[in-house]
Amino acid sequence: MSYRGLTILGCSSQQPTRHRNHGAYLLRWNGEGLLFDPGEGTQRQFIYANIAPTVVSRIFISHFHGDHCLGLGSMLMRLNLDRVSHPIHCYYPASGKKYFDRLRYSTIYHETIKVIEHPIDREGIVEDFGNFRIESRQLDHLVDTLGWRITEPDTTKFIPEKIKAAGLKGPIMQELINKGRVKVNDTIVHLDDVSYTRKGDSIAVVADSLPCQAIVDLARNARILLCESTYLEEHSHLAKSHYHMTAKQAAEQAKRAEVQQLILTHFSARYNTTEEFVQEAGEIFPNVFAAEEFCSYEFPKNPS
């Protein structure tokens, strides 16, 4: 089974610190590598994380403020240098097309990789291609900003002892899958009689935003919500004026959405540590973590 997990490559906001790089988040899932908001220095962060950049197959840019996109050009150039054979899909707000182009073509180099652009100009399902579904929602920030939800499909899992008891084997199994019922020895066997549905996992990624309904919609029942929490409550006035959230506000969104786990990120450089973020959020939503550079959050498939 391929690795399934979220690796934090950076978790600072506008300004990196000695201990936190600009944000960048790698989701390895179902054989693909999804890179969210590669800030400045992302290529180097892969080295420290001991992860080959070639795992990246899709890049998501929430918006075109520098701390969320300055690493895009260098990542594309690195993938080009490594001569990856798979296409690189890039998703971003359509209104930022000119900024995407400036980052992509900011230096002289011979591009040989296949870059497939997906400029997003509407909310809803962006792609649905079997391994997972990509959805976007417009967040409440100073510029066009997208939040993302990645959801894998539900799958049917057979119960071996019930399959055996029903006398099912061979080609009739495929007929059962296709039709939902088969006749075996004068008995009708329904798919539900010998199987159960494994609920597909989902993760929501929320970059810069004020609290809004779109966050709740994106994160509804998600296994993980990766959410910006730039400030503590004592600086809530800054959060409001800069269209960001506090740790408490992020926790309130997670609680409303009934997510399983909340990971806070995008911390202001004014804070040296993140313990207080967890404390403030934990009063609202207990299963909360503060993102740490190079920390990975594994999530094996749901058993049911």
Swiss-Prot record:
InterPro entries according to UniProt: Metallo-B-lactamas, RibonucZ/Hydroxyglut_hydro, RNase_Z/BN
Catalyzed reactions: Endonucleolytic cleavage of RNA, removing extra 3' nucleotides from tRNA precursor, generating 3' termini of tRNAs. A 3'-hydroxy group is left at the tRNA terminus and a 5'-phosphoryl group is left at the trailer molecule
Disulfide bonds: none
Enzyme class, broadest EC rank: hydrolase
Binding site for Zn(2+) 1: H63, H65, H141, D208
Cofactor note text: Binds 2 Zn(2+) ions.
Location of the active site: D67
Domain of life the protein comes from: Bacteria
Pfam family, one: Lactamase_B
Cofactors: Zn(2+)
Molecular functions (GO terms): 3'-tRNA processing endoribonuclease activity; zinc ion binding
Positions bound to Zn(2+) 2: D67, H68, D208, H266
The entry's keywords: Endonuclease, Hydrolase, Metal-binding, Nuclease, tRNA processing, Zinc
EC number(s) from the headed UniProt entry: 3.1.26.11
PANTHER family in the record: ZINC PHOSPHODIESTERASE ELAC PROTEIN 1
Family: Belongs to the RNase Z family.
Assembly behavior: Homodimer.
Protein function: Zinc phosphodiesterase, which displays some tRNA 3'-processing endonuclease activity. Probably involved in tRNA maturation, by removing a 3'-trailer from precursor tRNA.
Protein name: Ribonuclease Z
Source organism per UniProt: Chlamydia trachomatis serovar L2 (strain ATCC VR-902B / DSM 19102 / 434/Bu)
